[in-house]
Amino acid sequence: MEENKRVRRKRYSGLYPKKYNEKYKEKNPEKYKETIQKVMKKGNTPAGMHRSIMVDEILHFFDIKLGQVGIDLTTGFGGHSKEILKKLNHTGHLHGIDQDPIELPKTRARLESYGFNKDNFTLHQLNFKDFDAIDTEGFDFILADLGVSSMQIDNPDRGFTFREEGPLDLRMNPNVGIPAYVRLLEMSEIEIEHMLIENADEIYAKEIAKEITKAKIQGRYIRTTLDLHQVIASALQKVSKKVYEEELKKASSRTFQALRIDVNSEYEVLFEMLDKLPGKLNPGGKVAILSFHSGEDRLVKKAFKQYLNDGVFSMTEGPILPSKEEVFNNPRARSAKLRIAIKG
C-alpha cells in the first residue's frame, strides 16, 4: 500500500485577500502599489478606480489652446479633467459637473493633489442637464462621458452591480429620487417588460418581468442586488445549460442597465442636455460625447445630425471606436462610441 505523500501548502499569491478586511486591496493604492500594477498589467481595472476612455482621441480633437474655457459634464474620477487641465497649463478655466455627492469631494481633492486649484477649475454638484446654469458666456469645448464610473460600479453600497450584495439603489445621486427596489414595486409587469426592452434591448424581458411580478405577489421583496440577480436566474431556467451562465451574466447586466436608466431618467436628461448644447458653445466650439449603449448613441447621433442639417454644426464625425490596444488594457472601453462635432 502506497504511503500518502505530503502535499506542500500552496503559497499565498497575493491576488486574493489573506484577511477579509483586506478585500479589494487595490482600493488602498498607497499600501498596495504592486497589486495595482499586477491588476492593470492583466488589462483589468483596479477595484474602486476609474480609467478614463479614449483620452488621446478626445484631446487630439479638442486641440486645446492656452486660455480657453471648457466644461467636463461628467467629471467622475477626474481622469479626463486632469489631462485637460494639463493642456490648459494653469491658464483659462475648466468647469466640472457631477451629480454624485459622494465622489465629487474626492475628485476635488484628487485634482488639487495634482497641483491644480480654484483658479484652474471649478466643480459643481449638478445634473448635467442643468449645465447652462453655470455663469459663463460660453465654452470652447464640452465633454460628456455617459458611462457609469468604476467607483460607483465597484462600491456595493451603491447597488450598481449584481456581483456583490448591496441595496438595490442605482441612483447617481442617492439624495434625489427613489431607489430601484421601490421603483420595481411601483411598476406593473407590462411596464417592467417595456422598460427592459426600451432601455437595454433585453431578449428575456418577458420572462424577467413575469418572474419579478411573481416574486412581488408572493411577498419576496427584491431589496438587494443579489435578490434581483436570483430572480433573473429563475427567469432563465429554460435556457440551455451549455449557455446558461453566460446568458445569466448578460441578462443581469442588461437588466441593471435598464433599471439604472429608468431610475435616473437618463434618456430624458440626455435629451435636455443635447437640446442646450448649441446655445452654450462658442463659435468654433467643439463637443465630444462618449456613449456606451445603443439607446444613448441613437440620441446623440440624431441630435448631431439635426444640428448639422440645420447649419448649427459645421461638422460631425462618429462613431469613433477605441483602439484594440485600449480595449485590451481596459475591457470596460469595449462598448464605447465617441461622437464629435464643431459649431459653425
UniProtKB/Swiss-Prot annotation:
It is found in: Cytoplasm. S-adenosyl-L-methionine binds at G78, G79, H80, D98, F131, D145, Q152. Keywords: Cytoplasm, Methyltransferase, rRNA processing, S-adenosyl-L-methionine, Transferase. SUPFAM superfamilies: Putative methyltransferase TM0872, insert domain (SSF81799), S-adenosyl-L-methionine-dependent methyltransferases (SSF53335). Its EC number is 2.1.1.199. Disulfide bonds: none annotated. One of its GO terms (biological process) is rRNA base methylation. One of its GO terms (molecular function) is rRNA (cytosine-N4-)-methyltransferase activity. GO terms for cellular component: cytoplasm. InterPro entries: RsmH, SAM-dep_MeTrfase_MraW_recog, SAM-dependent_MTases_sf. It is an enzyme of class 2 (transferase). It catalyses: cytidine(1402) in 16S rRNA + S-adenosyl-L-methionine = N(4)-methylcytidine(1402) in 16S rRNA + S-adenosyl-L-homocysteine + H(+). The keyword Cytoplasm applies. It comes from the Bacteria. HAMAP family: 16SrRNA_methyltr_H. Belongs to the methyltransferase superfamily. RsmH family. Specifically methylates the N4 position of cytidine in position 1402 (C1402) of 16S rRNA. This is Ribosomal RNA small subunit methyltransferase H 2. The gene is rsmH2.
